[in-house]
Regions:
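C-terminal transmembrane helix-loop-helix hairpin of multi-pass membrane proteins
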Residues: 119-222
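Membrane-interfacial loop-to-transmembrane-helix junctions in polytopic alpha-helical membrane proteins
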Residues: 1, 24-28, 59-66, 90-93, ...
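Juxtamembrane "helix-exit" motif on the non-cytosolic side of transmembrane helices
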Residues: 49-54, 110-116, 166-172
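N-terminal topogenic module of multi-pass integral membrane proteins
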Residues: 1-63, 173-180, 193-222
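Small-residue-rich segments of transmembrane alpha-helices in multi-pass membrane proteins
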Residues: 37-43, 99-108, 152-165
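Cytoplasmic-side transmembrane-helix entry/capping segments in multi-pass membrane proteins
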Residues: 29-35, 92-101, 148-154
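C-terminal ends of transmembrane helices
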Residues: 14-25, 78-90, 135-145, 194-201
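Membrane-proximal helix-loop-helix units in multi-pass membrane proteins
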Residues: 68-141
Length: 222
């Protein structure tokens, strides 16, 4: 996938993560979700039309169409987030879509690794598969406590899977980045997410007792 567009994907992941963390009101995230969602859809359509103009798939190669599929996967996510927020829609359908998107992302991971032989992008797609799975847990399950870890994961991945790779790609350095460093960064993010999930689950199962901070009650003396 052309990583230039992921400068803006990084921005959307950051904003949506902050929404899940409670730092940004949901309605204020609508414009950026709409704009980036529409831009990614337009880019995907352009790739498809260009590939068709080049002739049969063997001549054009499989990579452009896989890129278009990836753009549409993210585009539908952001557009659905925007529409749900505008209409006050309940988010379980988006959550189940994210489970499907996680499965597709896993397939694209294998394609990038085994067919297109691009291990750098394979690592990123593996990370996005985990991100979509986290969104499924946050939106389609009764585990409300999983929303904050999912938000933190989105914020971290906005940097490690989108912004930094996109900027490196613009500078022409992405392909030269050590694969071990790329893999290590994504592994570290997933470990942090797992730790947050365990912590939030413990808090949900064993909530801390409320601490009384007001004045002591006055009792009548005998």
């Amino acid at each position: 996938m052309a990583l230039v567009a992921f400068v803006f994907v990084g921005a959307v992941l950051l904003i949506n993560g902050l929404v899940l963390l409670g730092f940004v009101p949901p309605r204020s995230s609508v414009p950026i979700n709409l704009l980036v969602g529409l831009a990614l859809a337009g880019t995907a359509v352009q790739i498809i039309l260009t590939t068709d103009a080049l002739g049969p798939a063997p001549a054009a190669g499989p990579s452009p169409l896989w890129s278009a599929a990836g753009f549409m996967l993210f585009s539908f996510t952001y557009l659905t987030v925007a529409v749900n927020t505008l209409t006050g829609g309940e988010g379980s359908a988006l959550g189940w879509y994210c489970l499907w998107a996680a499965a597709i992302s896993a397939v694209i991971t294998l394609v990038q690794l085994l067919v297109l032989q691009d291990p750098h992008l394979a690592v990123l797609w593996g990370a996005w598969a985990i991100l979509f799975a986290a969104f499924f847990l946050a939106q389609a399950t009764p585990w409300a406590w999983s929303q904050r870890p999912a938000g933190a994961l989105a914020v971290m991945q906005s940097v490690t899977t989108a912004t930094i790779p996109a900027l490196l790609d613009l500078a022409g350095w992405w392909r030269q980045a050590p694969l071990a460093l790329v893999l290590g960064a994504q592994a570290a993010v997933v470990v942090v997410y797992a730790v947050l999930m365990v912590r939030e689950r413990r808090r949900a199962l064993h909530p801390e007792p409320a601490v009384h901070t007001g004045p002591l009650p006055v009792t009548a003396s005998a």
